[in-house]
Structures are given as structure tokens and as C-alpha cells.
Amino acid sequence: MRDISKYQGIIPAFYACYDEKGEVDEGRVEQLAEYMVRKGVKGVYVGGSSGECIYQSVDDRKRTLERVVRVSGGKLTIIAHVACNNTAESMELAAHAQSLGVDAIAAIPPIYFHLPEYAIAQYWNDISGAAPDTDFVIYNIPQLAGVALTMPPFREMIKNPRVAAVKNSSMPTQDIQMFKAEGGEGFVVFN
């Protein structure tokens, strides 16, 4: 059974840090990471909605994660959101995150085109396969992704031994209970 203690506590989203020209500011990234360490949070969720992942290049996302890991690696649990608008870049970010030693990677479902549930599960499994030694977090955010995580793909996903958690941002609070009950002992549900 995996040790879930690294996921218990406050794990805030890590905000995007830009300079006056709108470029990722690595110095500000490091300052924010240092701030999180000083404040005593359990970890950080890097590269998600608050990190403006959809608007950043793969290189910007890699550099941001590298700076966060450099400052807070070993001090904070680091979950790297790696989803992109295509599977190949998502897998590239997943492999990069694993090479840095993050605790977990996470991904929203593919956006824009509404894919069938089996294709969403395959997308997530492909991404998690690019980081085979790293936990995977399913991110359920239907209000932005345009698709809600239902039980059939969830059940399919938890067959994957790397799937450790679901980050649930859906409105029905019953989803939290449903995912926890189905995920079982040792499965984490972030809210």
C-alpha cells in the first residue's frame, strides 16, 4: 500500500509568476516557492489552472517546475499538472516531472473536443505511462474541461497502479464521497 501521508495537509495551487513583459519570471517563481516553504504548507500543485497551464509553452512549464523543485524539493510534496492540448506534449511534461523527482503528476481530461470516456481513460493512462515511477492524480474539473469524470472511466483508471488520487473540483459534493468509496483504503481525494 502506498504512503498517502505526503498528500495529507494543505497543498495550494502554485500561481503563475510573470515579469512586466509577460514572460515567466524564474526569480519570482523561486520567491513564491520559498514563501510556501516558510508558511509550512504540505505541498504545492504546480502548473494547473492557477499556474495558467493552458496559456504557457511546454518550455515555460518545464522551467517553472524546475525552479519549484530546486527551491522546495524534499521540503514540500510537489504535484505537477502536465496536461496539454495534445498527448505527446503531456507525456513529455510527465517524463520531465518524473526526472525532477516530483511526488505526483496530474492531468485534466482533453479539452475542446468531447471525447468518449474510453479515450479519456486512454489519454490519462498514456500520460501516466510516461512517468511510470510517479503517482498519477486524475483532475476532475468539468466546469472548465467540459466533461465530468463518471464512474465507468474512474473504475477503469483505478486499475492503473499509478493512480493515487483524484483532484475533484466538481460542484456536487457527493462526488467526493463517491470517489473515496470507490477508490477504497489508501486512495486520496483532493478538494
Model-identified regions with their sequence ranges:
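Active-site beta->alpha loop and helix N-cap motifs at the rims of alpha/beta catalytic domains
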Residues: R2-P12, C17-A148
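Catalytic alpha/beta core domains of metabolic enzymes, predominantly
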Residues: S128-A130, P142-N191
